[in-house]
């Protein structure tokens, strides 16, 4: 099993690479790529960790050597948020980066599962899909927007509020991966009930958690370590599913049946070929139904922005 991390010299990429080096199954290969010249050194640094995971780093304009033979590609390359920016401010820079990298994936490892971490995810996933489609290699079951950070934040915040163990909580989060498009389904957390005020406050905190980190870092970065952990969790779930483990379910932003929007975050069952089943989002509370209806225009605009970027 070969996993490639693109953007491996950045804050998310280094955290992700560290977690994969320590947690990938024995015999796996880990390939690190970044435009920054430090990348081969990041790989050498990680190579000293005593796990049976082969690691190599590549830098420069050409990502193809890093991508050769990859089963999974995780893309975290791009610029990070600064205070006062929202995820859409990142679009102008990150759209071109994602397009360029996905074009190289399309020719080098077109059958790989691709996890997009680079924000704005609502838009960058649509960009990736259009690039792959143009190249004639698009498989909607193998392209994912990694929204796992929304899930781990939800689990953490609910556990804090209710005095529970975070690993025992599983909050499904649907919609998209920015602002109002992030919708935690708190009504579906088994064995825990919330007041209306708690639901409103938690939902808002989960939606604004990225900004909470950006402001707390006072201009020194965005959520890199928690995002690295979230991306590693998603990547390792994909590895397990590709290797034949059954019953692996994660929430992810995928091309859906189009009922809500072309791309939609929802629980998906993973298997040997990527998504095996897009699971039903279940019955929503009145609060959730209202939040879903009012976010769809924003989500659709985000998606259209990505589609148009490639088509024009």
Swiss-Prot record:
User: What keywords are annotated for this sequence in UniProt?
Assistant: NAD, Oxidoreductase, Tricarboxylic acid cycle
What's an example GO BP annotation here? tricarboxylic acid cycle
PROSITE patterns recorded: MDH
A Pfam family this chain is assigned to: Ldh_1_C
Q: Where is the active site?
A: 177
Among the entry's GO cellular component annotations, what is one? cytoplasm
Enzyme Commission number, as recorded: 1.1.1.37
Q: Name one GO molecular function term.
A: L-malate dehydrogenase (NAD+) activity
Query: Which Gene3D superfamilies does the entry mention?
Result: Lactate dehydrogenase/glycoside hydrolase, family 4, C-terminal, NAD(P)-binding Rossmann-like Domain
* Family annotation (InterPro entries): L-lactate/malate_DH (IPR001557), Lactate/malate_DH_C (IPR022383), Lactate/malate_DH_N (IPR001236), Lactate_DH/Glyco_Ohase_4_C (IPR015955), Malate_DH_AS (IPR001252), Malate_DH_type1 (IPR010097), Malate_DH_type1_bac (IPR023958), NAD(P)-bd_dom_sf (IPR036291)
Positions bound to NAD(+): 7-13, 34, 94, 117-119, 227
Q: Which reaction does it catalyse?
A: (S)-malate + NAD(+) = oxaloacetate + NADH + H(+)
What residues bind substrate, as annotated? 81, 87, 119, 153
NCBIfam families attached to this UniProt entry: MDH_euk_gproteo
The family annotation for this protein states: Belongs to the LDH/MDH superfamily. MDH type 1 family.
Q: What does this protein do?
A: Catalyzes the reversible oxidation of malate to oxaloacetate.
How does this chain assemble?
Homodimer.
What is the recorded name of this protein? Malate dehydrogenase
Organism encoding this protein = Pectobacterium carotovorum subsp. carotovorum (strain PC1)
Name the encoding gene, please: mdh
């Amino acid at each position: 099993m070969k996993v490639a991390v693109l953007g491996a010299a950045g804050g998310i990429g280094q955290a992700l690479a560290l977690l994969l080096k320590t947690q990938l199954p024995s015999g796996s290969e880990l390939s690190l790529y970044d435009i920054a010249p430090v990348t081969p050194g990041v790989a050498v640094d990680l190579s000293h960790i005593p796990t049976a995971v082969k690691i190599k780093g590549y830098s420069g304009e050409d990502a193809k050597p890093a991508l050769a033979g990859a089963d999974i590609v995780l893309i975290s390359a791009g610029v990070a948020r600064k205070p006062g920016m929202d995820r859409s401010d990142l679009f102008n820079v990150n759209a071109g980066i994602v397009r360029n990298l996905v074009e190289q994936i399309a020719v080098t490892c077109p059958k790989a599962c691709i996890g997009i971490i680079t924000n704005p995810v609502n838009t960058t996933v649509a960009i990736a899909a259009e690039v792959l489609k143009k190249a004639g290699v698009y498989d909607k079951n193998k392209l994912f927007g990694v929204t796992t950070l929304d899930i781990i934040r939800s689990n953490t915040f609910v556990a804090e509020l209710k005095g529970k163990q975070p690993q025992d909580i599983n909050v499904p989060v649907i919609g998209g991966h920015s602002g109002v498009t992030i919708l935690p389904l708190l009504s579906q957390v088994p064995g825990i009930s919330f007041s209306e005020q708690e639901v409103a406050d938690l939902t808002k905190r989960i939606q604004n958690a990225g900004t909470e980190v950006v402001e707390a870092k006072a201009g020194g970065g965005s959520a890199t370590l928690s995002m690295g952990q979230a991306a590693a969790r998603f990547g390792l779930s994909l590895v397990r599913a590709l290797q034949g483990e059954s019953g692996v379910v994660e929430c992810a932003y995928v091309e859906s049946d189009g009922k809500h929007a072309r791309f939609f975050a929802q629980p998906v069952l993973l298997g040997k070929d990527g998504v095996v089943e897009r699971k039903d989002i279940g019955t929503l509370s009145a609060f959730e139904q209202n939040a879903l209806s009012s976010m769809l225009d924003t989500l659709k605009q985000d998606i259209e922005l990505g589609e148009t970027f490639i088509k024009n």
